[in-house]
Structures are given as structure tokens and as C-alpha cells.
A protein has these predicted regions:
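Rhodanese-like catalytic fold shared by cysteine-dependent sulfurtransferases
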Residues: 1-39, 43-143
């Protein structure tokens, strides 16, 4: 739970640095631009982003994103858009990224825009039945 006033303080801090907030249309336009890289980061705790997030978003908790920007956003002069759902993590993260010289924006998604991430099925079967291999396949046993 967010402490009373935390979201307002975080928003005021970001606003004081003139960090713009994008609506859904502006975000779509940025992400659709083939001439400029735009990163979209979910600044929430991973336990939140694993339940529902925005399509194309990368989970990057705010502190980790700030500390490992070269890992998360390796393209020079790229734009960064950060979002959360409680209005605390994203503004604070955006503020730090702004101070580091990044072109950064905030986004507050509508709850209906958040979707469950795709479920990845893991198959730990180690072998493939011979019948499943194409007749013309060449099998090389390196073990």
C-alpha cells in the first residue's frame, strides 16, 4: 500500500522537472515510430508486473532501471517511458533518469489497458521421439 501523499509528492517532484505525461495515443505514436527507439518500462515491483502489464513493456523495477540503464536501454539517444499503477515508482524513476540526461516520459495506463503477460509453457522433456524427426533429417550424436 502506498503511504498517504506519496503519489502526490512523487508527481509534484516529476512535474517540477518538467517530465511530460503521455496519454495512450501519444504512447502508441512513440512506440510506432520506426525512426526512433522508445523503451517502455513497467517500474513496479516484479510481483505486480507479472500479474498484468502493458503490451511490449519490459519489467524493470525503478531502482534497478536507474542503476542498470545501460543494460535495460542500450540504444543511445533513445526515449524512455515509465509507468506504474500507483503513481509513485514511475515518477521517482523518471526523475532520476531525467537527471541522468535521458529523454523520459511518464504514462498512467488505464486499468483496462493492462493485460496478463503471455504464459510460457516449459517442457522439460529432454529427448525427441525418433518418429517426430523428419525422414530426411541428419542426426549427429555429440554425446
Amino acid at each position: 500500500p502506498v503511504a498517504a501523499g506519496a503519489a502526490q509528492a512523487a508527481q509534484a517532484w516529476a512535474l517540477g522537472m518538467s517530465i511530460a505525461t503521455l496519454d495512450a495515443g501519444e504512447l502508441h505514436d512513440m512506440l510506432s515510430n520506426p525512426y526512433r527507439t522508445t523503451y517502455l518500462f513497467d517500474a513496479r515491483d516484479p510481483s505486480c508486473s507479472s500479474r498484468a502489464t502493458l503490451p511490449r513493456a519490459v519489467a524493470a523495477p525503478g531502482g534497478q532501471l536507474v542503476q542498470q540503464t545501460d543494460y535495460y536501454a542500450p540504444v543511445r539517444n533513445a526515449r524512455i517511458v515509465v509507468f506504474d499503477t500507483d503513481g509513485v515508482q514511475a515518477p521517482m524513476t523518471a526523475g532520476w533518469l531525467h537527471q541522468m540526461g535521458w529523454e523520459v516520459y511518464l504514462h498512467r495506463p488505464e486499468a483496462t489497458a493492462l493485460v496478463a503477460p503471455p504464459r510460457v509453457e516449459y517442457d522439460d522433456e529432454r529427448g525427441v521421439p525418433v518418429e517426430a524427426v523428419a525422414a530426411d533429417a541428419v542426426i549427429i550424436d555429440v554425446g
